[in-house]
């Protein structure tokens, strides 16, 4: 009967000690998995961010090409006063000093070439 008790006690002690080791091992394993999961989430987040930045960069590039400053400025029509230093007459027109009409208002007008 004593041998049965000793054997049972020995099995009990081994089970408890190995169980504790397994518990610590499981805890360490879970910590490693969570750290790997965090690094995986960081990697996935960076990958998604890169994928989203590519179309955004293309859209911003298109917007910069079509800015308001790049469009053609409006031109001045025939018989309209113009500035001698900055003539913005339409194509086919020249900024000239008027002959008789308009000499009292402004010194230069857009005329046909």
Curated annotation (Swiss-Prot):
Task: Report where it is expressed, by tissue.
Answer: Expressed by the venom gland.
Q: Which InterPro entries match?
A: Toxin_22
Q: Name one GO cellular component term.
A: extracellular region
Q: Name one GO molecular function term.
A: toxin activity
Keyword annotations of the record: Disulfide bond, Ion channel impairing toxin, Knottin, Secreted, Signal, Toxin
Q: Compositional bias (Basic and acidic residues) spans?
A: 58-69
Q: Which residues are assigned to the propeptide feature?
A: 22-74
**Disulfide bonds, which pairs?**
75-90, 82-95, 89-110
Q: Cite the residue spans of the region called Disordered.
A: 58-83
Q: Which residues form the signal peptide?
A: 1-21
What subcellular compartments does it reside in?
Answer: Secreted
Task: Tell me, in a sentence or two, what this protein's role is.
Answer: Probable ion channel inhibitor.
Q: Describe the family membership recorded for this protein in Swiss-Prot or TrEMBL.
A: Belongs to the neurotoxin 14 (magi-1) family. 01 (HNTX-16) subfamily.
Protein name listed in UniProt = U11-theraphotoxin-Hhn1a
């Amino acid at each position: 009967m004593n041998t049965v008790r000793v054997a049972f006690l020995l099995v009990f002690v081994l089970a408890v000690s190995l169980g504790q080791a397994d518990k610590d091992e499981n805890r360490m394993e879970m910590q490693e998995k969570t750290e790997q999961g965090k690094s995986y989430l960081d990697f996935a987040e960076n990958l998604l961010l890169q994928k989203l930045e590519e179309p955004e960069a293309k859209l911003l590039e298109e917007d910069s090409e079509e800015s308001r400053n790049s469009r053609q400025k409006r031109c001045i029509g025939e018989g309209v006063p113009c500035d001698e230093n900055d003539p913005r007459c339409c194509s086919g027109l020249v900024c000239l000093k008027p002959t008789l009409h308009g000499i009292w208002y402004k010194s230069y007008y857009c005329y046909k070439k």
